[in-house]
C-alpha cells in the first residue's frame, strides 16, 4: 500500500506541469522527491530505534493522538468531521473523546491558536485512507513539503537563471530541510504553505491575477496561521514591502523596506495601545515605546517556559540566553546574540549528537557562503533587489524570534528549517559566479 502512494505521488510530479523546474530534468526532480522519501524512513528509524519514547517523539505523538481521534469516526462520523474542520470541539460528547488525546491541550496557553491540533487533524484526515500505516502519512507529508519547495524554486529561478543547479541545491538538498521536512512534523506543512503562499503572491504582483490565486492565498494564510502563527507574522513585513514596491515603483527599494518594517514593528509593539487610540487614553511616549506591552511580556514568558522545560528534560544542547523582561531595552540588548545563535549555531564544538552534528556541518556551508559573498560579491540588479530584501527580512526576523526565546540548539535546528532555503538563496544572489569560476576553475565541473 505504501508503494501505491509512492507511485501515485511520483506520477503527479512526472505528469504535472507545475513540477517542471527550469534548468532541471524531470528525472532529477523525481530523484529529489525519492530522496525526501528515503529521509522520511531515516527519521522514522531514528525515532523508532534510537529515541524510543513515543510520548516525547513529535513524529509519533501527534500520529498516535490522530489514531485516537480517528476512533471517533466509528462512534459518529459527523462529530469526527466537526473536530477535524474545527466546527465543534466543545460539546460534551466530543470533549469527552478529545480528553483521551495526550497533546490536544497545551500546558502553556498564551491565547494563541494551539498548533498541536493542526498536525493531529492532518494525521486524522490521512488516517481515512492510510489504514494506520505510518509511512503513508510520511509520504503524503513528503509530497506536500516537496510541492512547497517546488514553489520556492519557481519563485526564485527568474532571478538566478544562470544558477539553476545551485538554486536546486539551496532549495531541495540542504540536510536540515531534507531531514526535518520529510517527517510527520509541522515543518512539512510550514514548507508547503509558505512556499505556495509566496508563489501565488508573486504571481499576483507580477500581473497574473486570477480569482483562484486569491482564493489559494487566503487558504494558505489560514494554514500558516493554524500551523505556526509566528511564521506568518515573520513573513508579513516582507510581503507588505513587496506590495508597497509594486505600487510605488522600484526607486529606493531598500529605504521602502526599512520604513515598512519600522512602521510594522512599532505597530506590533503597540498593538494593544493602538486599539485604545479612539478612547484618548494614550500619550505619544506610550505609542513609541510600547510601555507595559503584552507582546514583549509574551516573549518573556515564552522564553521562561522554554528554559523551564529544557531544564526539566535536561536538554543536552541547552544554551544560556539573555533574560528578557517586558521592556524594549532587554529585547534590543539580546537581539544580536539571538540572531547569531540561530544563524551560526550549532557549531562543531556544540555537537553532542548526530543530528546536531549534521546541523553544525550545514552551518559550515553557510559560513563558507558568507566568505564567498564577501570575496566574490556581485551587486544585485534592480529586478533582484525586492526578492533579495524579502529573503533577508524573513531570515532575520525569524532568526530574531527563535534566538530570543529558544535555549536548546536541537530545537533551534528544527525551528529555523523554513528559512534555510531563503538563507542560502541570499548568498546565491550575491555571489558572482563568473568571478568564482575564474578564480577557482575546478568548480566549473560542479556549477
Predicted regions and their residues:
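Transmembrane-helix signature of polytopic, membrane-embedded enzymes
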Residues: 131, 135, 152-173
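Membrane-interface helix-loop-helix junctions at transmembrane boundaries of multi-pass membrane enzymes
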Residues: 18-19, 158, 207-212, 372-393
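Extracytoplasmic catalytic/substrate-binding loops of multi-pass membrane glycan-assembly enzymes
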Residues: 51-64, 74-100, 110-122, 335, ...
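Membrane-interface alpha helices of multi-pass inner-membrane proteins
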Residues: 178-179, 213-235
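Transmembrane-helix motifs of polytopic, lipid-linked glycan transferases
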Residues: 12-16, 125, 137-159, 368-372
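Hydrophobic, aromatic-rich transmembrane alpha-helices
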Residues: 7-12, 338, 342-347, 359-382
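Short acidic/glycine- and proline-prone juxtamembrane loop motifs at membrane-interface regions
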Residues: 183-186
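Membrane-interfacial entry segments at the cytosolic side of transmembrane helices
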Residues: 24-27, 209-216, 247-263
Amino acid at each position: 500500500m505504501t508503494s501505491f502512494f509512492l507511485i501515485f505521488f511520483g506520477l503527479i510530479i512526472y505528469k504535472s506541469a507545475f513540477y517542471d523546474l527550469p534548468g532541471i530534468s524531470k528525472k532529477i526532480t523525481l530523484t529529489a522527491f525519492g530522496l525526501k522519501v528515503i529521509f522520511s524512513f531515516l527519521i522514522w528509524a531514528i525515532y523508532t530505534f534510537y529515541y524510543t519514547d513515543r510520548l516525547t517523539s513529535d513524529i509519533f505523538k501527534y500520529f498516535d493522538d490522530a489514531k485516537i481521534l480517528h476512533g471517533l469516526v466509528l462512534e459518529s462520523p459527523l462529530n469526527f468531521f466537526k473536530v477535524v474542520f474545527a466546527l465543534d470541539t466543545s460539546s460534551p460528547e466530543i470533549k469527552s473523546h478529545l480528553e483521551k488525546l495526550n497533546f490536544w491541550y497545551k500546558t502553556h496557553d498564551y491565547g494563541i491558536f494551539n498548533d498541536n491540533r493542526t498536525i493531529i487533524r492532518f494525521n486524522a484526515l490521512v488516517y481515512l485512507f492510510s489504514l494506520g500505516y505510518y509511512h503513508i502519512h510520511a509520504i503524503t507529508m513528503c509530497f506536500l513539503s516537496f510541492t512547497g519547495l517546488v514553489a520556492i524554486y519557481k519563485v526564485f529561478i527568474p532571478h538566478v537563471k544562470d544558477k539553476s543547479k545551485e538554486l536546486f541545491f539551496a532549495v531541495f538538498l540542504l540536510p536540515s530541510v531534507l531531514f526535518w521536512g520529510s517527517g510527520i512534523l509541522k515543518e512539512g506543512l510550514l514548507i508547503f504553505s509558505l512556499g505556495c503562499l509566496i508563489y501565488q503572491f508573486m504571481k499576483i504582483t507580477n500581473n497574473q491575477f486570477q480569482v483562484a490565486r486569491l482564493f489559494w492565498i487566503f487558504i494558505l494564510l489560514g494554514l500558516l496561521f493554524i500551523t505556526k502563527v509566528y511564521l506568518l507574522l515573520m513573513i508579513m513585513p516582507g510581503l507588505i514591502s513587496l506590495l508597497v514596491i509594486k505600487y510605488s515603483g522600484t526607486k529606493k527599494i531598500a529605504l521602502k523596506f526599512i520604513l515598512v518594517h519600522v512602521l510594522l514593528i512599532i505597530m506590533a509593539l503597540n498593538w494593544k495601545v493602538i486599539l485604545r487610540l479612539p478612547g484618548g487614553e494614550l500619550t505619544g511616549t506610550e505609542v513609541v515605546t510600547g510601555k507595559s506591552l503584552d507582546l514583549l511580556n509574551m516573549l518573556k514568558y515564552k522564553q521562561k517556559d522554554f528554559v523551564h522545560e529544557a531544564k526539566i528534560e535536561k536538554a543536552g544542547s541547552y544554551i544560556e540566553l539573555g533574560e528578557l523582561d517586558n521592556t524594549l531595552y532587554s529585547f534590543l540588548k539580546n537581539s544580536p546574540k539571538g540572531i547569531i545563535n540561530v544563524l551560526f549555531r550549532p557549531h562543531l564544538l556544540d555537537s553532542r549528537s548526530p543530528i546536531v552534528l549534521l546541523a553544525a556541518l550545514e552551518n559550515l556551508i553557510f559560513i563558507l557562503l558568507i566568505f564567498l559573498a564577501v570575496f566574490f560579491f556581485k551587486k544585485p540588479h534592480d529586478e533582484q533587489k525586492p526578492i533579495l530584501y524579502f529573503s533577508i527580512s524573513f531570515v532575520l526576523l525569524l532568526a530574531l524570534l527563535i534566538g530570543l526565546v529558544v535555549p536548546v540548539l536541537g530545537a533551534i535546528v528544527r525551528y529555523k528549517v523554513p528559512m534555510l532555503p531563503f538563507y542560502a538563496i541570499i548568498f546565491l544572489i550575491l555571489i558572482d559566479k563568473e568571478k568564482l569560476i575564474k578564480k577557482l576553475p575546478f568548480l566549473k565541473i560542479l556549477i
